[in-house]
UniProtKB/Swiss-Prot annotation:
It comes from Nematostella vectensis (Starlet sea anemone). A zinc finger (C3H1-type) spans 161-188. Transcription repressor. The keyword Zinc-finger applies. It is found in: Nucleus. Residues 310-356 form the G-patch domain. Residues 69-86 have a biased composition (Basic and acidic residues). One of its GO terms (biological process) is negative regulation of transcription by RNA polymerase II. This is Zinc finger CCCH-type with G patch domain-containing protein. GO terms for molecular function: DNA-binding transcription repressor activity, RNA polymerase II-specific; RNA polymerase II cis-regulatory region sequence-specific DNA binding; zinc ion binding. One of its GO terms (cellular component) is nucleus. The keyword Protease does not apply.
Length: 508
């Protein structure tokens, strides 16, 4: 069916429901039960049609992806795919679809690594939170340049609903994009910005201490420990947000240290529910330092050295004005010889405060950020070596603290996805006609997918045998799905026939 036809059908069904609702509200007694049943059937039919519309949009998207994939394969040149010179696109396909077993093993080793990342809330509060690596991603910049290595992390102690991992996303069933979903689909972080995981310290936990406690909605709120049951390892805590008490196990508590409590009290003025996991005192102390953005090396020849990367217009202008290289500036050549350093003053500080910092020699050398980038290698061995460097960097920086994605999936109460009913085989009130209509729509969609897979397989029949094997497996998978749907269709038709025969016998 066309997308516009389905939308028009949905609008017609809604108009019919409005008309039926008007008749029911008028107070007529005759046929009231039939109208109510008709209204329920129309409501269910609207739901089925909307699902069909959604599957149609998905099939269109899959068609677009298949076209891109086929064009991606057609652009390759297998003749030039040698060990010494590999085309970028062919190497990417071969490395990531067939010969990427080592990278997949490395990905599995990285997944679940615990770390600590900086996160800025929507209201501007910057905090540090414990997290766990969910996936390793690389953002391509250019075919001839490098890939920027990033990881997608999930927060272990989310302090806001937008940070709670989406349960449907973890199951691979979420219908919303990351920005549209009210829960988190992961947070992208540069590998170089990852910090070591901070283990909760239960050695000095006592009554009256501040902590983060998990609530029924999966969010960790600011709380206070009232008492401790040492035998059962349970805590009686008081939620400050809800003003209620609860008894929680050890896994639902995250004790806050003195620095975290201090930073939390400072951030409460900006947010009602925000919790800071890093010390703002250390940040403010770091802001009171004058930094050199650039500082000369001290050699006399350093003046103008940067012009080897430019046209040297500055040196030419100075030479026209009579400047002799090696001497100082000024009329008599007694001025400064070295270039002027670039100084970045602390933001929001007065000149008197900056002068005081100069006297205290609080001058900080510029730091160079070590950017770890995933280089796209021309050979398989080179790409595996670079990927292992990123993995080694993560393991070296974060240690070997590992977690389980299953713990995130079932960690917070009420976060499990609801089990939706797909078929009521034993229910007498099941509308088998609607089920049959739904199966017909799905069969039609799968047949279209099967035709596309067969066309793609025919295009790659005379080409690389490895690509042919991939498309053959895809075709067989879609064909098996079609056979399952045909069996379901046959069973539903038998159910409808039995129901009709039973009704005829009952009337007789």
């Amino acid at each position: 069916m066309d997308e516009d036809v389905l939308k028009e059908a949905i609008e017609q069904y809604k108009q019919q429901i409005i008309q039926i609702q008007t008749v029911l509200e008028s107070g007529q007694i005759e046929g009231r039960a039939e109208l109510a049943k008709l209204k329920d059937d129309l409501t269910e039919l609207i739901q089925v049609t909307e699902e069909s519309l959604l599957s149609l949009k998905k099939s269109q998207l899959l068609q677009l992806l298949e076209q891109q994939e086929s064009s991606h394969h057609d652009s390759g040149t297998p003749e030039t795919d040698t060990k010494t010179s590999v085309d970028y696109r062919n190497s990417y396909v071969n490395d990531h679809t067939i010969d990427d077993n080592d990278d997949e093993d490395n990905d599995e080793n990285i997944i679940g690594t615990k770390c600590r990342v900086a996160f800025t809330q929507e209201w501007g509060v910057k905090e540090h939170h414990n997290a766990m690596v969910f996936k390793l991603e690389s953002i391509p910049l250019d075919e001839e340049t490098v890939d920027q290595a990033k990881v997608r992390v999930l927060f272990l102690n989310p302090t806001h609903r937008s940070m709670v991992p989406c349960p449907y996303f973890l199951e691979g069933k979420c219908k919303f994009a990351g920005a549209e979903c009210r829960f988190s689909h992961g947070y992208l972080v540069d590998v170089e910005h990852l910090k070591p995981f901070k283990e909760p310290d239960f050695s000095s936990v006592k009554a009256g201490q501040r902590c983060l406690a998990r609530y029924s909605d999966g969010v960790w709120y600011n709380s206070t420990i009232k008492s401790i049951k040492h035998e059962s390892h349970e805590f009686l805590i008081h939620y400050e947000t809800y003003n209620t008490d609860a008894t929680l196990p050890l896994d639902d508590i995250y004790p806050l240290g003195p620095e975290e409590v201090e930073s939390d009290s400072e951030s409460d003025s900006q947010s009602d529910t925000g919790d800071s996991s890093s010390s703002k005192a250390a940040i403010e102390q770091d802001d009171d330092v004058i930094r050199y953005a650039w500082k000369p090396t001290g050699a006399l020849s350093s003046l103008g050295d940067w012009e080897q990367h430019t046209k040297g217009i500055g040196s030419k202008l100075m030479a026209k004005m009579g400047y002799i290289f090696g001497k100082g500036l000024g009329k008599d050549g007694e001025g400064r010889v070295e270039p002027i350093e670039v100084v970045v003053l602390p933001q929001g500080k007065s000149l008197d405060k900056c002068a005081e910092l100069r006297e205290k020699n609080k001058l900080k050398e510029p730091f160079k950020r070590k950017k770890k980038k995933l280089v796209v290698a021309s050979t398989t061995s080179a790409s595996q070596g670079k990927a292992s460097d990123v993995f080694d960097f993560i393991n070296h920086k974060l240690g070997h603290s590992k977690g389980s994605l299953h713990d995130l999936r079932v960690s917070h109460p009420g976060a499990k996805p609801d089990i939706r009913k797909t078929r009521k085989s034993a229910d007498e009130n099941t509308n088998w006609n609607i089920q049959l209509f739904k199966i017909h729509e799905e069969i039609s969609s799968v047949k279209k997918q099967l035709n596309k897979q067969e066309e793609a397989l025919q295009r790659h029949t005379t080409r690389d045998s490895r690509n042919k094997t991939i498309f053959t497996e895809k075709r067989d998978s879609v064909h098996n799905r079609l056979q399952e749907l045909l069996k379901k269709e046959k069973k539903i038709q038998e159910k409808i026939h039995q129901k009709d025969q039973h009704r005829k016998l009952t009337v007789f």
